[in-house]
C-alpha cells in the first residue's frame, strides 16, 4: 500500500500528533508492507493560493512554481493520504491549509450537484488510485467536545467519506513521565491501524476508544497549568 503522510505540524519530526499517526501506521504494517512517504509541510516551499483559477481552465497546471507541484503528484500516486496535524485555533495550521487550498488544480471549473444537494467542482485528473483520505488530529485540551468540531466539519465537506481520528491530550505523547498512560493508547492506535488495513474503515467502538482522553480532564488541566496536588 502506497501511503502519503502530510505532516502539518510546525514542529516537524517533534510533532505530538505524529506519534499518533506512526502508531496507527505500525498497526497497518502488520497486514502487509507499506510504502510510506512523510512530507513535513513546514519544511517545504508552498505559497498560498492566489485564487486566479487558471488551473481550472488549463487542465490543472498551477501558475505557482513551488513544492506543491511535487506534492500533487505524490497525492495522485498514493492509495492513502493521511493529513496529520495539531489543532490550531479550532482548525489546521496555516501551512497545511495552503496545501488543501493548492489542491485546486485537481478539479475543473465545471460544477456538479451530488445526491445531497451539495455543489462541488468536477475532477479533471485521474484520482482512481486514491482509495482513502484520513485526518489524524491531536489537540492540547483535555476533551474533544468544543474543540475539534470546526476542523472535523471542514474535513467532512472537503473530503466526504474520509476517516477522521481526533485525539485530545496529545502533548502527553511527547512527555516521558506520561508513558504509563500513553503506552495503552499507542497500543490501541496500533490495533486500530490493523483494523483499518483489514476493513478499510474503523468501527465506532474503535474510534471511541482511541479518541477518548487518556487521563481525567481535571487532572490533565492541573498538570498543564503546572499544578501538582
Residue ranges and their predicted role:
Residues 162-170:
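Beta-strand-loop-alpha "switch" segments that mediate conformational coupling across diverse proteins
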Residues 1-111, 175, 183-229:
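N-terminal beta1-alpha1-beta2 submodule of the flavodoxin-like/Rossmannoid cofactor-binding fold
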Residues 108-162:
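Short, glycine-/small-residue-rich phosphate/pyrophosphate-handling segment
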Amino acid at each position: 500500500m502506497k501511503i502519503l503522510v502530510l505532516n502539518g505540524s510546525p514542529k516537524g519530526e517533534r510533532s505530538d500528533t505524529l506519534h499518533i499517526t506512526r502508531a496507527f501506521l505500525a498497526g497497518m504494517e502488520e497486514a502487509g508492507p507499506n510504502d510510506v512517504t512523510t512530507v513535513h509541510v513546514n519544511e517545504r516551499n508552498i505559497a498560498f493560493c492566489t485564487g486566479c483559477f487558471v488551473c481550472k481552465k488549463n487542465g490543472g497546471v498551477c501558475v505557482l512554481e513551488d513544492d506543491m507541484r511535487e506534492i500533487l503528484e505524490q497525492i495522485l500516486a498514493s492509495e492513502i493520504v493521511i493529513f496529520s496535524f495539531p489543532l490550531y485555533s479550532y482548525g489546521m495550521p496555516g501551512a497545511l491549509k495552503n496545501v488543501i487550498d493548492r489542491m485546486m488544480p485537481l478539479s475543473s471549473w465545471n460544477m456538479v450537484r451530488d445526491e445531497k444537494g451539495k455543489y462541488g467542482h468536477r475532477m479533471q485528473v485521474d484520482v482512481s488510485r486514491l482509495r482513502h483520505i484520513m485526518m489524524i488530529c491531536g489537540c492540547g485540551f483535555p476533551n474533544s467536545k468544543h474543540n475539534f468540531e470546526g476542523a472535523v466539519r471542514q474535513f467532512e465537506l472537503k473530503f466526504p467519506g474520509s476517516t477522521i481520528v481526533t485525539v485530545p491530550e496529545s502533548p502527553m505523547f511527547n512527555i516521558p513521565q506520561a508513558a504509563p498512560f500513553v503506552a495503552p493508547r499507542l497500543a490501541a492506535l496500533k490495533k486500530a491501524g490493523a483494523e483499518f488495513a483489514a476493513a478499510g474503515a474503523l468501527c465506532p467502538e474503535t474510534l471511541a476508544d482511541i479518541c477518548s482522553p487518556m487521563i481525567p480532564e481535571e487532572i490533565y488541566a492541573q498538570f498543564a497549568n503546572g499544578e501538582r496536588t
